[in-house]
Every structure is written in C-alpha cells, then in structure tokens.
Amino acid sequence: MTTYYAHSAQDELGNLLPYEHWQTLQSHLVNVGEMAAEFARVFGAQEIACQTGKLHDLGKYSEAFDRRLHGGPSVDHATAGAKISVERWGNVIGKLMAFCIAGHHAGLANGNGEGDNRHTLKDRLALQFGADIPALDNLWQQEIKLPQNLSAPPLKPDAHHPFFSYAFF
C-alpha cells in the first residue's frame, strides 16, 4: 500500500530527510480538520470546519504530488477537495467549503466573474480529474472518513438574499 505525505522534511542544508521524518497526509488532514473544528466551535460550525480541513489538501493523494515532494513541478492540490465538497454536499454547504479549500493558498477567488488573474471557483470546479488535475488515489476514501450529510451553518439568512448572509459565513 502506498503512503502519501503532506510535507517532506529537510535538514539544515536542504537535503531531504528519510520518510520517517515526513508528515503523512492522513495525519495532516485529520489534524487540520480537528484544529479547524476547534476554531469554528465558537460560532457553531465545527463540523463544517472539520470536513473542510480534511479536504483542503486532498489533491496530495496523487502520484503527481508525490513527484512534487521529490523536486517535481508544482501541482494543483486544492481543487480536488473543492470538487469533492460540492459533489458530496451540494451547492450551498459544499460550495461554501469549496471557496475555503480552493483558496487556502492563493486567496479567495470570485465565484463566476473575472478576477485578478485567478481562475474563478466555477472554472476550477469544472476541471476534470485525470485530465486537468491529477487523478486521486482511491486510498483517500479509506483514510479520510467523511459524513454523508452536513447540517447547514447556524445562520439566519435574509429571506430575500440568503446567499448574502452566507457570504459572511
């Protein structure tokens, strides 16, 4: 079975250290999920935050990212988790999560319109696994457990403009 890593480790001269010094991807995603949940507990969104944290680096479950850890080219590793969140939890909760996941390195992108040379979330969600972004190893589904359903965030959206309220979430 393949072990995927979130981060490599280097010595003071920049040489890669042995794998036992590297952080496994499963450990990283679970830990980030737990930390995000703690931060979001104060406003009642701990479950959404936990799952967002678990998905933020999901694209690292790929051969392309493993090559990156060994000096290969950069790899889009955030879009995968954004896509999975929308596929699993839909266009409200999943899309709120997708903005966070897709923007966790580059900042938040616009939803549909043109922005500052960043791809929109709509464009990124349209990317295809194995063609536009790296295919994921199915191992992720064994290592990262996701609930089937998530409750809506504890907001009281405006009846006429509900997404305006969600934008502040």
Region spans (language model):
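Accessory nucleic-acid engagement/destabilization modules that flank
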Residues: M1-F169
